[in-house]
């Protein structure tokens, strides 16, 4: 379930032929709406001022020697979007995917601490391009962490880092339907440390979940519950101090 490539390599774009790759919106973001760095404002004549900007007046710097318009303002067409932050956080302003979440968010609990176990409501279910982010700190001498994407009493996706299973550290993923657990998928790469902070990100894709921890891709888990709109809650439990839990669209 895991591979050895870095998150930086995986962020080369949404057209990445590697099916494990994270979308290009993470880390290598294009400029925001209207950005087009280095391009002229859309219109018939390159260098033309944006509509409504003092008709008849030349844009700054268009004619050498002409009085400068709007001192200190950048020339039209060179408004780059905000710089992308470090790691896997998308910037606001990314268009939302079609589905129940028309805006980008983030939505969820404000910065904590939050009481564990904690339930994050997912009204409308989950949809492709939905990104869930959990921040916290592993407690000293921790035994387990669990994330449960729930559909009623069923668990569509169980993500369960275990710190000491027969003296081994392992991550177990599974699905529970009609009170019966399915086949376990086990992951030996274990990025969690007792007493250390962590960031878990879960990205919903059309046919699987992707999980990254501390900005590095960890695993993916194919959907066993196909009706994603019925997954209405994320349960967070285990030996952690929970700081925040939220979701957004990318």
Swiss-Prot record:
Protein's cellular compartments: Cytoplasm; Nucleus; Secreted
Modified residues (Phosphoserine): 6, 12, 188
Function: Galactose-specific lectin which binds IgE. May mediate with the alpha-3, beta-1 integrin the stimulation by CSPG4 of endothelial cells migration. Together with DMBT1, required for terminal differentiation of columnar epithelial cells during early embryogenesis. In the nucleus: acts as a pre-mRNA splicing factor. Involved in acute inflammatory responses including neutrophil activation and adhesion, chemoattraction of monocytes macrophages, opsonization of apoptotic neutrophils, and activation of mast cells.
Motif Nuclear export signal: where in chain: 226-241
GO molecular function: carbohydrate binding; chemoattractant activity; disaccharide binding; IgE binding; laminin binding; molecular condensate scaffold activity; protein phosphatase binding; protein phosphatase inhibitor activity
Record's compositionally biased regions (Pro residues): 48-60
Region feature Disordered, mapped onto this chain: 1-60
Stretches for region 8 X 9 AA tandem repeats of Y-P-G-X(3)-P-G-A: 36-109
Galectin domain segment(s): 118-248
Name this polypeptide is given: Galectin-3
Signal peptide: none
Subunit and interaction comment: Probably forms homo- or heterodimers. Interacts with DMBT1. Interacts with CD6 and ALCAM. Forms a complex with the ITGA3, ITGB1 and CSPG4. Interacts with LGALS3BP, LYPD3, ZFTRAF1 and UACA. Interacts with TRIM16; this interaction mediates autophagy of damage endomembranes. Interacts with cargo receptor TMED10; the interaction mediates the translocation from the cytoplasm into the ERGIC (endoplasmic reticulum-Golgi intermediate compartment) and thereby secretion.
GO CC terms in record: cell surface; collagen-containing extracellular matrix; cytoplasm; cytosol; extracellular exosome; extracellular region; extracellular space; ficolin-1-rich granule membrane
Record PTM N-acetylalanine, positions in chain: 2
GO biological process, one term: negative regulation of endocytosis
Organism whose genome encodes this protein: Homo sapiens
Pfam family, one: Gal-bind_lectin
Transmembrane portions of the chain: none
Tissue: A major expression is found in the colonic epithelium. It is also abundant in the activated macrophages. Expressed in fetal membranes.
Start-end of each Sequence repeat: 36-44, 45-53, 54-62, 63-69, 70-78, 79-88, 89-100, 101-109
Positions annotated to bind a beta-D-galactoside: 181-187
Low complexity: bias regions: 38-47
InterPro entries the UniProt entry points to: ConA-like_dom_sf, Galectin-like, Galectin_CRD
Alphabetized UniProt keyword annotations: Acetylation, Cytoplasm, Differentiation, Disulfide bond, IgE-binding protein, Immunity, Innate immunity, Lectin, mRNA processing, mRNA splicing, Nucleus, Phosphoprotein, Repeat, Secreted, Spliceosome
Xref: SMART domains: Gal-bind_lectin, GLECT
